[in-house]
Amino acid sequence: MSADRRPLVLIVDDSSHVTGPLQILFEETGRRVVIACSVATAVRACEAERPDLMLLDLSLPDGDGLSVLELLAGAPALPPVTVALTGHDDPLTVQRCRAAGCRDVLLKPVPVRDLLRRASEWLPGEAAASSPNG
């Protein structure tokens, strides 16, 4: 297990146009990043890495992104904070995400400043973890 105490963000999306910029953004602001592009790889990443935050696209090649939460329900590998990323802002989608356990639902594309501000709210302990000796 890594001694690196920086917050770990799991980005689950099958588009490199989404994951690439998000990875750069989070790494430049002191977080570690793991990328998953499917339900199956997201579940494996949660089990292996235990992320602090999961940004979860709802449309994945092997199923509904919310099925990641269903597959990990009650397991220690379930991230403490999951945020849904979607291109659909209809009330039913938001309701489904909240019912599945998502802390927040963000409409893509997410403004960078908004995402950084919210990430600081979702990861309250990251200030100490981002110190040079952290």
What are the residue ranges of the model-derived segments?
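The feature encodes the CheY-like receiver
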Residues: 61, 90
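As written
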Residues: 65, 98-103
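Two-component/phosphorelay signaling modules centered on CheY-like receiver
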Residues: 16-34
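C-terminal output helix
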Residues: 92, 110-119
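Active-site residues of response regulator receiver
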Residues: 57, 86
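Short amphipathic alpha-helix used as the core "switch/output" element in two-component signaling
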Residues: 44, 66-77
